[in-house]
Amino acid sequence: MIKSECFTRQWCEQVAQRLNYNDIQLIEKVVRALSLLEMLIKSGCPFHFKGGTATMLLLGGATNRLSIDIDIICPPGTEIERYLSDFKDFGFTKIDLVERKSPGKNIPKSHSKFFYQLAYTDRVSGEGYILLDVLYEDCHYQNTLEIPIVSPFIELDSEPLNVKVPSIGDILGDKLTAFAPNTTGIPYYKKEKVCSVEIIKQLYDIARLFDRVDNLEITAQSFRRIVTVEMAYRDIDNLEAVFDDILQTSILIATRGKEGVGQFDILQDGIKKIKSFIHTSNYHIDHAIVDSAKAAYISTCIRKGVTAVEKYPGTPEIVLDMSIAPALTGKLNKLKRIFPEAFYYWAKTSELLQDN
C-alpha cells in the first residue's frame, strides 16, 4: 500500500526535485490516482485497467508522461457503486454521484469524481479530484497480465498490489483506435471542450508502445476487435474510414497543416500543452512529427495485413535511397533531411499503400 507520507506536500516537493518537474499539483494527482487504483483492487471490483495511467505503469521508465485519471473496463451489469464505499480509507473526502450516461453514442460508461484535500495549499477549501471512467463491456484484449503498482511517484509500506492490464501489444491497438478524431477516436471537441491534449496523449503513447513491440500480430487483433465495437457505438460501418482518419491526421502533423484532413490548429495546441504532463524530457512539434509517422505506419501495416515490422535502425544514411511512393503526398519528401526517422516510416507506409 502507498505510504501515508506520499500524500503530503513535503513528499510531492521531494518528487518534484528528484524528477526535475515542478508541477506539484500534477504530482499529487498521480499519487491520488494510484491510491484510487489500490482502493478498487482491495474492494474486489472485477476490472481491467486501461488508458494512460495503465500505460504509465506498463512502460515504467520508457515513458515520461504523467497520467492522472483511472480508466477501467468492467463486465456488463457491474454495479460499480458497490466497490466505492471505502473511499475515505484511501484519502478521499467525498465522491460525486456515479453518473451513468451514453451521450448520443450508446456507449455504456459511468464517470465518478473522487475529491481530496490538496496537500500543496493551506486553504481549507483547497480541493482536487480524480476521475474514474468505467466502460461496461466484455474485455476485447488478446492477452492480459498482472503487474505491480510501482512508480517513482510513490513509496510502499508493504508488497505492491497487482493490477490486471492489457499487454503492450493490446494497449497499442486500443490507443490506435483513439487516435482517429473524426471517427472512433477522441474528437476535436466534446460539446464545447477542446480535446487537443487528449488527442496528442494518444499519439505520444502510441509511439512509445510501438518502441516496445517486435511485431503487430497482437496489436492488429486487439485493434480490429476494439475498433469494431467503437464503430458500432458511433454508427460507423466503414473500417477504411478509420484507417484513413489515422493516416490523414498523421499527415496533417507531418506537413504542419499543409496536407491531410483535420484541424491542425487544435493538434498544434495539444502538442504545446502536453509538455506540462511530461517530466525529465521535452516534447514539441519535431517529436510529434516522428510519432505521427509511427502511427501512420502501424495503422497501415494493420490495414494491409502486415504483422512484421521494419523499424528504423537509427542510421540516417538508410533513407538516402528511399523515397515517398505516389500513394502519398510528395510534401513528405521534405522530411528526409531533417527528420530521417519520420521519413523512413512514411516511405515504408507509402510502399505498403502503393503495393496494394
Protein language model features and the residues they cover:
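Short histidine-centered catalytic/ligand-binding loop motif
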Residues: L19-N22, D71-G77, E192-K193
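Active-site nucleotide-donor binding segment shared across nucleotidyl transfer reactions
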Residues: E38-I70, C74-P76
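Short, conserved acidic/polar surface loops in the N-terminal third of protein domains
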Residues: L59-A62, R82-D86, N143-E146
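Catalytic cores of NTP-dependent nucleotidyl/adenyl transfer enzymes across multiple folds
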Residues: S4-E5, V15-L19, V30-L34, S102-Y283, ...
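Metal-dependent nucleotidyltransferase catalytic core
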Residues: I73-P108
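A generic N-terminal leader/anchor concept
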Residues: M1-T53
